[in-house]
């Protein structure tokens, strides 16, 4: 529960509209719960459901690499609202990784499907993808955290 709220708070502090903040809070529900996009659309409207859908990974049967490559390519041309929610999600994720890294060191990489090198590839390319249409405050923060974690 803490992660979705943290994503919403990042968006709120960055000045995004209520609909974007709500989508940030709901961004993982379709993938991680029984509350699906049709439920979000019914309860919160088409706009919020579309933002959440844009932040969801494709078919989980695809390899980690294929899913991440899809995300990187999709976000290059996604709407500014989808890019903001995706960026806030990754920003909170990387800050959590940094916190764990500071406590556990390189052992932290054992918790992931792919190791440090692949995570660095993903986050570095994600930053470039998110800024493809132009930089914004959350992507600048994400880039700083990526450098902080991987350029130690």
Q: Where are these predicted regions, by residue range?
A:
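Active-site helical microenvironments for divalent-metal-assisted chemistry
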Residues: 1-152
